[in-house]
Amino acid sequence: PTDSKYATFPSVSAGWVVNKEDFLKDVKLISYLKLRASWGANGSKSNLPGNEDKELWTLAGIRYPDATGTYQSGAQISKLVNKDLKWERTEMADIGFDLRLLNNKISFTADWYNKNTENLIALGTFPMSTGGGMPFVNAGTVNNKGFEFELGYTNNDNEFRYGASLNFSTLKNEVTQLDVNAPVAGASVRGYNLTWFEEGQPIWYFKGYKTDGIFDNKAEADSYNTKYGTTF
């Protein structure tokens, strides 16, 4: 939007190569050890299609009678605009270390991260009486946090060289704040909304009915019908 074209997104990082210190220089087991930490912010409008700063009108099929009964051409808004829309802002903190052992043959990396996205851009939910296409809104705040680990092995001693690695990660995703009046609907099939943006839940989680399973045979269906008075 025209009112929020520019923003500032700073970042900072620091690292310490520990194996270069005097107390580790003579430790042959450790080839490399680095402790690191970083914090940064960035902006995004990737969820936003073009021309969202423009209000669109349509003339097609818009007619109304005047006082004499003569029909005149008219116009109506076909897409609303949200001039207060702001950048998505993501702040991420990361703490980790890189370790290599036995002449760089064995490597291990570990990270903890906490990523917080504010003013997440999503299509707004408004009363049907509003009319026209719904504008995008800053829908809320999403938090992602977890751990990442990678263990690797590299053999460079022979003509035949090879390497292998194993990684593992965890992720907790949650909508921590909802800035609109109701949950925001996402993808839909045949008119039914399948995914939702709702406070206290993972972002765009699937929402539907729980089932007790399926009938494996006619006897199970007959038993259910007898118990609940249905006609499956």
What are these regions (language model features)?
Residues D222-F232:
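Short, intrinsically disordered, charge-balanced linker/junction segments flanking boundaries
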Residues N156-R161, I214-D216, F232:
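Generic structural signal for short, solvent-exposed loop/turn connectors between secondary structure elements
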Residues P1-F206:
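Extracellular/periplasmic, surface-exposed regions of secreted and cell-surface proteins
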Residues N167, Y205-N217, A221:
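Exposed, low-structure sequence patches enriched in small/polar residues
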